[in-house]
Amino acid sequence: DPYIIDSIGWAYYLVDDYIKAEKFLNIAVQLMPDDPIVSDHYGDILWKLDRKIQARYFWKNVLQMKDTDEEMIKNINIKLIYGLDNS
């Protein structure tokens, strides 16, 4: 289940294991390329792995998704301006 894969990856992110988190979220993004939450999570992980250009690519992509709500749009725009550490 792609949602479980996302959740496992996010759990690794929350305990600062970004390498393992990236492995799971990479799979989740491939399985659910149009899910804004998964792409946002993946962007956050990429940022923590110092892959900032790729992180911004995923965050910008979230802004184009039809299921992105207003609160997420606001949060993504803050990340795009200030990065993750200041959002």
PLM region descriptions:
Residues 7, 41, 75-79:
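Canonical tetratricopeptide repeat
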Residues 29-30, 64:
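Conserved structural position within tetratricopeptide repeats
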